[in-house]
Amino acid sequence: MARGGAACKSDARLLLGRDALRPAPALLAPAVLLGAALGLGLGLWLGCRAGRQRTRHQKDDTQNLLKNLESNAQTPSETGSPSRRRKREVQMSKDKEAVDECEPPSNSNITAFALKAKVIYPINQKFRPLADGSSNPSLHENLKQAVLPHQPVEASPSSSLGSLSQGEKDDCSSSSSVHSATSDDRFLSRTFLRVNAFPEVLACESVDVDLCIYSLHLKDLLHLDTALRQEKHMMFIQIFKMCLLDLLPKKKSDDELYQKILSKQEKDLEELEKGLQVKLSNTEMSGAGDSEYITLADVEKKEREYSEQLIDNMEAFWKQMANIQHFLVDQFKCSSSKARQLMMTLTERMIAAEGLLCDSQELQALDALERTMGRAHMAKVIEFLKLQVQEETRCRLAAISHGLELLAGEGKLSGRQKEELLTQQHKAFWQEAERFSREFVQRGKDLVTASLAHQVEGTAKLTLAQEEEQRSFLAEAQPTADPEKFLEAFHEVLERQRLMQCDLEEEENVRATEAVVALCQELYFSTVDTFQKFVDALFLQTLPGMTGLPPEECDYLRQEVQENAAWQLGKSNRFRRQQWKLFQELLEQDQQVWMEECALSSVLQTHLREDHEGTIRGVLGRLGGLTEESTRCVLQGHDLLLRSALRRLALRGNALATLTQMRLSGKKHLLQELREQRALEQGSSQCLDEHQWQLLRALEARVLEEASRLEEEAQQTRLQLQQRLLAEAQEVGQLLQQHMECAIGQALLVHARNAATKSRAKDRDDFKRTLMEAAVESVYVTSAGVSRLVQAYYQQIGRIMEDHEERKLQHLKTLQGERMENYKLRKKQELSNPSSGSRTAGGAHETSQAVHQRMLSQQKRFLAQFPVHQQMRLHAQQQQAGVMDLLEAQLETQLQEAEQNFISELAALARVPLAESKLLPAKRGLLEKPLRTKRKKPLPQERGDLGVPNNEDLASGDQTSGSLSSKRLSQQESEAGDSGNSKKMLKRRSNL
């Protein structure tokens, strides 16, 4: 049958079919009956679909939750590795050529409703309407579509313009709420396949592609954070080595002391990383456990737990750095000035390292986004290729049906024979399509398994080579010559190694995709050959024997059927090109959204940085009194912690942006399907009547409405997740504030100690000089007398310290006993209070309301225990602090009395005149009174420097008081030593 180029080609073909029926009036009555039966069957089928569409429009959010995402992907970013971008562009061009060669069709002019509405029947569903609208119920025997566990079957958007009109009416009467709590709960419970590598997505039969790809993007961000954290630890060790060499220039790198200090830090970092990995593994295994599927709610929960654990790890690293100075002073007897200088150098170089890590994180996060876009592109190509067999099947069956209709219209084939032949062809074609699907899944999984094994092997070899490269670089490098260049060179080595690993993974993904494409093409051509055999057997063997037609006429009819199928495939190819164009537009829109997210993240980080820096500078400016060195040390520490915190928040912001796209993917996919359907309807025919034009306009209005809904949903979802990010930023800011309060407090404490030490040393030197001069000038001072005074003074100090230790231990035991009594009393009260709750529980069997009230009361009572417990601990801390202050004041008074007695006896021994002897203690008292006040106040801060005390641990109080006692004892020993010096002077005087 000849084909013209007219616009109304399909209508002309249908008229030809009706003309062919007119020469056989004897078959008019059977044809009318058959047409009525077919029309009734088609009407019932459309009624069922319209009912499903009404349900879909009434539950729009549920449908969005269950859509199979295919269009939420991004185009490759313009930033990143140029070589990688060129390779991806070449691969994308190859994939596009493959799609252009074998894009499947989508509709025919016979199956107007099923095919024009882009209804895609699953391969493993055998019961389908036949091409002419009839059906074969005998094939419907326990054959259903495979569905993901815990995921209901979803409906397509409106199946035709008519069903769209009905759906619009129903949708207008439904609720207009978009972002309700119920909608959120349903969407967060959406189930998709748990994947660990991209090749796993390619060979799966039923997957939510976009959610799987975005989950892989989240894994990439986590791997990036792990790599950067390990690099920071390695750079920290190298910087610490350089600082130790500067601090201990006489020590060699293989010195025992040097290695002991270094091994302590390395061991702490290993334990820190090991503990973090255990927590991350436990979080990964929680929730669904070993299940093959996962929900979006589980993903968001795990990402939140990951963020909390990473922040805790970051804070632990801060504490480890802060303890280095105390570690050097306490364990290795390093001077405070040298340790402080080492910390300043370490902080300054770590700031430079954080800057390098921040720049690297920004670039590699964009590179990870580029890889995600490439994965979406490759997944879309595979999706198109897998659909080509179904489109081939539909087009060939539609052409066969049309050819058999022509024979039936000419009276050469009865209706029963036509139905029997169509049923046989449908069964044979769809069974072959199912075989294609089964073989593709089976062989595809084998390809994926081999690809993953090859990737693991290659990664292991690359890791060993990179570790050897790191060792050789560190062995050859001279870090002390130019630390900045060394850090930059070391960072370049590590960054290049990370890029090599990413390139290896991407190359393996491309190789796996190419293998799957080749497999799909191979199976497709094999299936098409089988289809051709079915057609040849039908028209060259079955029809001649059944109808008695000459072989030439059957062969001519076969050629007509093939031409008709080719024409329909051409229409399908044009529609697929339109689909691909819409997909590219969607990628461009998503790319714009990602760029906006990056800009918003940059603005947020700038705001947080300016806010924190302004706060810390304002605090230091109002405090005053700190030296320039102390101020610079505090600002450096704040800058380092702030850089680390902002880098963590930036990565968390990327993860939340990914979760936003995952939440919106359902509505985006629905809107994309509506746009594709509009393009299909616009290109299906140029001759539309008024009713069809109205329905097309209704479809366009539906597209605009869904676009508006998507925009509103996107704004609300972004706002919700951005508020979560701001809350986490506030928590990190509080941690940063706590560390800076401690740092500023320590700086003020050091400043106060230095000022007090200088004043006290000056006054003590003046007083001792005066006393020594008086003793030397006295003729009554002898060696025996001075020795007797010193011995008595030592004995008195020993008794004072013993009494102080006993009183301190007794008071701490008393406080502990009181706390235990209070705890037991509170427990008794709690056990006696729930009597009313038990009575309420007695009625729990009667009404569910009583059970609910009981649960609420128990929850409130349980939550009320926390502030009570905190208040008790605070009260115990206050009591212990008060007792320790009292004991310290008593000890200080007793030591001062002993000192005054020694001075008085020494003055009496020297026969110093009474007026002078009274003047000296008075002067001493005037100097010590303000000094006592200065020494008395910083003592709780000194205890605070040791860490938060534990109420149940008496050793903390012993350590605090013990350190104080040792300080007092060393002070008195120094004074006694000065008295010994005066004794030596008297000996020299007597010898003279």
UniProtKB/Swiss-Prot annotation:
GO terms for cellular component: ciliary basal body; ciliary membrane; cilium; cytoplasm; plasma membrane protein complex. Residues 66-82, 957-982 have a biased composition (Polar residues). Found in the developing vertebral bodies, ribs, upper and lower limbs, heart, kidney, lung. Its main location: membrane. It is a single-pass membrane protein. Residues 89-99 have a biased composition (Basic and acidic residues). The chain crosses the membrane at residues 26-48. Residues 49-992 are cytoplasmic. Keywords: Cell membrane, Cell projection, Ciliopathy, Cilium, Cytoplasm, Cytoskeleton, Disease variant, Dwarfism, Ectodermal dysplasia, Membrane, Transmembrane, Transmembrane helix. It is found in: Cell membrane; Cytoplasm, Cytoskeleton, Cilium basal body; Cell projection, Cilium; Cell projection, Cilium membrane. InterPro entries: Limbin/EVC. Disulfide bonds: none annotated. Residues 66-105, 151-181, 825-854, 930-992 are annotated as: Disordered. One of its GO terms (biological process) is skeletal system development. Residues 156-166 have a biased composition (Low complexity). It is linked to Ellis-van Creveld syndrome: An autosomal recessive condition characterized by the clinical tetrad of chondrodystrophy, polydactyly, ectodermal dysplasia and cardiac anomalies. Patients manifest short-limb dwarfism, short ribs, postaxial polydactyly, and dysplastic nails and teeth. Congenital heart defects, most commonly an atrioventricular septal defect, are observed in 60% of affected individuals. PANTHER family: EVC COMPLEX MEMBER EVC, LIMBIN/ELLIS-VAN CREVELD PROTEIN. This is EvC complex member EVC. It comes from Homo sapiens.
